[in-house]
């Protein structure tokens, strides 16, 4: 269960190194070095690969459109998934990639939440990295925290073990 907002946000904030093509994300998967462009007043990531010699990471062509180029495919996938859920006699495994903010304190530990990064420049002109849990609005309009891959994978393993009676 991954909301379209999650896909949209991940695509729109994706960047790549123009030299080695390594992908990162300006909000969700940053590099060691962050830069600031005085002309555009924007922050950018600097590639971590030594061979790239400090290349400035750039937005992939078309990513500014978010999910629009793949919306029909996502809708078709959703329709197929809903149809599959109607099958009887077949055990189901349900995975959630987010947890409502209101429930998070009772159900998750902080390290299970996807970190989101923002940046600001302090008085000494140094870039300050701010880390907070990434909040998304799920498809039901509920403000939620996105989960890291490990807790989702653990849920998958536990449910499969239960279904297989292991």
Language-model features: locations:
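Glycine-rich phosphate-binding loop of ATP-dependent small-molecule kinases
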Residues: 1-166
């Amino acid at each position: 269960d991954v909301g379209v907002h999650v896909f949209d946000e991940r695509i729109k904030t994706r960047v790549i190194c123009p030299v080695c093509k390594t992908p990162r994300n300006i909000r969700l998967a940053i590099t060691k070095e962050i830069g600031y462009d005085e002309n555009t007043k924007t922050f950018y990531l600097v590639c971590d690969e030594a061979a790239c010699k400090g290349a400035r990471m750039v937005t992939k062509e078309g990513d500014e459109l978010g999910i629009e180029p793949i919306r029909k495919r996502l809708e078709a996938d959703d329709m197929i998934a809903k149809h599959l859920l109607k099958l009887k006699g077949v055990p189901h495994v349900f995975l959630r990639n987010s947890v409502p903010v209101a429930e998070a304190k009772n159900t998750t530990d902080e390290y299970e939440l996807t970190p989101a990064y923002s940046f600001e420049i302090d008085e000494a002109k140094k870039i300050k990295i701010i880390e907070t849990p990434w909040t998304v609005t799920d498809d039901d309009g509920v403000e939620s925290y996105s989960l890291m891959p490990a807790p989702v994978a653990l849920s998958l393993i536990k449910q499969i073990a239960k279904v297989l009676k292991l």
